[in-house]
């Protein structure tokens, strides 16, 4: 029974892995990806509410002035 010659397996496996790595890198680098989303500037409108022009103070039940 002849013995299997495994002396070339190492270089074959390494060269196959290097070739696959290069092919995948070329395939990935040729694809175009969408740009990352940029934040949208929102202009807030100032509304005139009647309670904004007045100053009101809310008293809690325990903080009422003494009578």
From Swiss-Prot:
What sections of the protein cross the membrane?
8-24
Where is it predominantly found? Answer: mitochondrion
InterPro entries of this UniProt entry?
A: ATP8_mammal (IPR039017), ATP8_metazoa (IPR001421)
- Superkingdom of source: Eukaryota
Keywords assigned by UniProt, alphabetized: Acetylation, ATP synthesis, CF(0), Hydrogen ion transport, Ion transport, Membrane, Mitochondrion, Transmembrane, Transmembrane helix, Transport
Tell me which Pfam families the record gives.
ATP-synt_8
According to its UniProt entry, the protein's GO biological process terms are: proton motive force-driven mitochondrial ATP synthesis; response to hyperoxia
Q: State one molecular function term (GO).
A: proton transmembrane transporter activity
Q: Which residues carry this modification: N6-succinyllysine?
A: 54
Localization in the cell: Mitochondrion membrane
Per the record, residues carrying N6-acetyllysine are 54, 57
A Gene Ontology cellular component where this protein is annotated is: mitochondrial membrane
How does the record say this protein sits in the membrane? Single-pass membrane protein
Concerning its family, UniProt says: Belongs to the ATPase protein 8 family.
Question: What is this protein's function per UniProt?
Answer: Subunit 8, of the mitochondrial membrane ATP synthase complex (F(1)F(0) ATP synthase or Complex V) that produces ATP from ADP in the presence of a proton gradient across the membrane which is generated by electron transport complexes of the respiratory chain. ATP synthase complex consist of a soluble F(1) head domain - the catalytic core - and a membrane F(1) domain - the membrane proton channel. These two domains are linked by a central stalk rotating inside the F(1) region and a stationary peripheral stalk.
Its subunit composition reads: Component of the ATP synthase complex composed at least of ATP5F1A/subunit alpha, ATP5F1B/subunit beta, ATP5MC1/subunit c (homooctomer), MT-ATP6/subunit a, MT-ATP8/subunit 8, ATP5ME/subunit e, ATP5MF/subunit f, ATP5MG/subunit g, ATP5MK/subunit k, ATP5MJ/subunit j, ATP5F1C/subunit gamma, ATP5F1D/subunit delta, ATP5F1E/subunit epsilon, ATP5PF/subunit F6, ATP5PB/subunit b, ATP5PD/subunit d, ATP5PO/subunit OSCP.
Output the PANTHER family linked to this UniProt entry: ATP SYNTHASE PROTEIN 8 (PTHR13722:SF0)
Protein name in the entry: ATP synthase F(0) complex subunit 8
Native species of this protein? Rattus norvegicus
Q: What is the lineage of its organism?
A: Eukaryota, Metazoa, Chordata, Craniata, Vertebrata
